[in-house]
């Protein structure tokens, strides 16, 4: 089992409903450590760059609008197999299909407002972390 880092965003629906502490409790209960965390207002440029992989998808504009509609909490999580573990803890993108006990089953309102983002690979985690954090921001 490898100790690794992953990237997380608590999305505007989570900050708007003031549930970031409850989401963090689920993350920590799963054995992941929050080693970097900042509450920010994502700019349009940041959102477009971050979700560039979805640029040609029909939901891209709506996604950018949503991610810039309010504050988000960007995080670096650390633990054994952090990428896979966090994806399991997040649950399916569609909260109706998410397993009981997952973040999205407990807190997400819809597919579009699904509370959290998590990196899908260790390589993407490194890239995503670097967009929002430098080494001095991470206290392992």
Curated annotation (Swiss-Prot):
Catalytic activity: a 2'-deoxyribonucleoside 5'-diphosphate + ATP = a 2'-deoxyribonucleoside 5'-triphosphate + ADP; a ribonucleoside 5'-diphosphate + ATP = a ribonucleoside 5'-triphosphate + ADP
Listed EC numbers: 2.7.4.6
Chain positions recorded as ATP binding sites: 11, 59, 87, 93, 104, 114
Domain of life: Bacteria
Main subcellular location: cytoplasm
Pfam families (UniProt xref): NDK
Required cofactor names: Mg(2+)
Any one Gene Ontology molecular-function term assigned to this protein's record: metal ion binding
InterPro entries in the cross-refs: NDK-like_dom, NDK-like_dom_sf, Nucleoside_diP_kinase
Top EC category: transferase
GO terms under biological process: CTP biosynthetic process; GTP biosynthetic process; UTP biosynthetic process
Function in brief: Major role in the synthesis of nucleoside triphosphates other than ATP. The ATP gamma phosphate is transferred to the NDP beta phosphate via a ping-pong mechanism, using a phosphorylated active-site intermediate.
Family (UniProt): Belongs to the NDK family.
Protein name: Nucleoside diphosphate kinase
